């Protein structure tokens, strides 16, 4: 056991060799272009028998969807769905307004009934 040395000092690791694992750096430009290509095209994938490609930031069906609905039909259905959601939101707003109106009218009716009962009681006391 050393008196003035640290027993926890690790041994130094030997430096790594700087050999590259790929031989792409040794190829000339034309060979690299042939091997790797510069035009990658749009990314495509197959998922559950459906071919999809990435266009304009969205995955769209490359051809006909497995259910027999094409891309235009899907877009039309999405647009219709959006319209129906907007209509549904408008109808919910109208129902909320009608419920507020009903509760206000009911409260006014109860107040008038109370006033009428008080007037009847005061009228009976006068007689």
Swiss-Prot record:
GO terms for cellular component: centriole; centrosome; ciliary basal body; nuclear speck; nucleolus; sperm flagellum; trans-Golgi network. Found in heart, brain, lung, liver, muscle, kidney and testis. Levels are approximately 3-fold higher in embryonic and adult heart than in lung or liver. It comes from the Eukaryota. The keyword Coiled coil applies. It is found in: Nucleus speckle; Cytoplasm, Cytoskeleton, Cilium basal body; Cytoplasm, Cytoskeleton, Microtubule organizing center, Centrosome, Centriole; Golgi apparatus. Keywords: Cell projection, Cilium, Cilium biogenesis/degradation, Coiled coil, Cytoplasm, Cytoskeleton, Differentiation, Flagellum, Golgi apparatus, Nucleus, Phosphoprotein. Disulfide bonds: none annotated. Residues 77-98 are annotated as: Leucine-zipper. Pfam families: Chibby (PF14645). Residues 60-112 are annotated as: Minimal region for the interaction with PKD2. 'Chibby' is Japanese for 'small'; the gene was so named for the RNAi phenotype seen in flies. PANTHER family: LEUCINE-RICH PROTEIN, PROTEIN CHIBBY HOMOLOG 1. Homodimer. Homodimerization is essential for nuclear localization and interaction with KPNA4 but is dispensable for interaction with CTNNB1. Interacts with polycystin-2/PKD2 and GM130. Interacts with the C-terminal region of CTNNB1. Interacts (C-terminus) with TCIM (C-terminus), TCIM competes with CTNNB1 for the interaction with CBY1. Interacts with FAM92A; this interaction facilitates targeting of FAM92A to cilium basal body. Interacts with CIBAR2. Interacts with KPNA4. This is Protein chibby homolog 1. It comes from Mus musculus. The gene is Cby1.
């Amino acid at each position: 056991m050393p008196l003035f040395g640290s027993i926890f000092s690790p041994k130094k690791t030997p430096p790594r060799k700087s050999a590259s694992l790929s031989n792409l750096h040794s190829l000339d430009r034309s060979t690299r272009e042939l091997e790797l290509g510069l035009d990658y095209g749009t990314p495509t994938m197959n998922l559950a028998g459906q071919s999809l490609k990435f266009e304009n930031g969205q995955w769209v069906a490359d051809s006909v969807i497995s259910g027999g609905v094409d891309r235009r039909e899907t877009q039309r259905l999405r647009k219709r769905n959006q319209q129906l959601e907007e209509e549904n939101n408008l109808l919910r707003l109208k129902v909320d307004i009608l419920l507020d109106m009903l509760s206000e009218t009911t409260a006014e009716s109860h107040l008038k009934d109370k006033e009428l009962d008080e007037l009847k009681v005061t009228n009976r006391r006068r007689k």
